[in-house]
Amino acid sequence: MDETGLNGDNLVLAKAVNRIGDSVREAVETSMKDERLKADLITNVSHDLKTPLTSIINYVDLIKRERVDNPKVQEYIEVLDTKSQRLKQLTEDLLEASKISSGNIVLHMERINLVELLNQTLGEFSEKFEQKGLISVVNAPSQAVYVLADSRRSYRVMENLFNNIYKYALEGTRIYIDLGFTEWKSADGSGSQAGVFLSLKNISAMELNVAPEELTERFIRGDESRTTEGSGLGLSIAKNLTEAMNGMFEISIDGDLFKVVLVFPKMDDVKPQTEV
């Protein structure tokens, strides 16, 4: 606030307002600096872990190919394999979350067939779902449905959502998967536009004592006892990536029913671009 020409109480008030403004500005700058430092630290640590972790995974793979007769040693190898793969996933999740929060993520937007991506992901998870007796009930068009998105990041979103189902769905239940067309508000709020939605519903194996919006916060898990393996980053990454690609991501909970809905603009209603 310009203090020129002010005096008395007005000058005192102006100085107070300016001090508050300066304090807020300093706090914001400090917070942004802390966030950058935090993001840089996570990125550097993740990169530093990557090389030795890759070596461990490769050596475990070589050991698994050897003839090992001792059952106890075989058990140790399996545990080592599982834990190293989990650490690899956690490292990748941390790196992805860091890129998103720091704004260092580069998106390669292109024409994506969402039906094809859904079928591909379903095929890759079919064996895992069978192990838990999970039955997929799919309602999707047989023809191609196109959206504008980043291919690799779209798969990451889908993979995270299906991983979440695999970890937390009640065994022997159905998973309802719907893909279709809808109307939704445009990004600038100026009106509605044609969109493509993907809805995933499953029954949770445990009570969901958490608000839907909290499930997309980092390191928050529906399994408070942490008896299942996970980083607590999967849904957060899925939401942030979806929104970075101009999509909508929404979670709803009704008792033990968990539902997530994604919406993307139809390809006809968006202008193609190569990078963001």
Task: State where each predicted segment sits.
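Conserved micro-motifs of the catalytic ATP-binding
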Residues: 102-107, 146-149
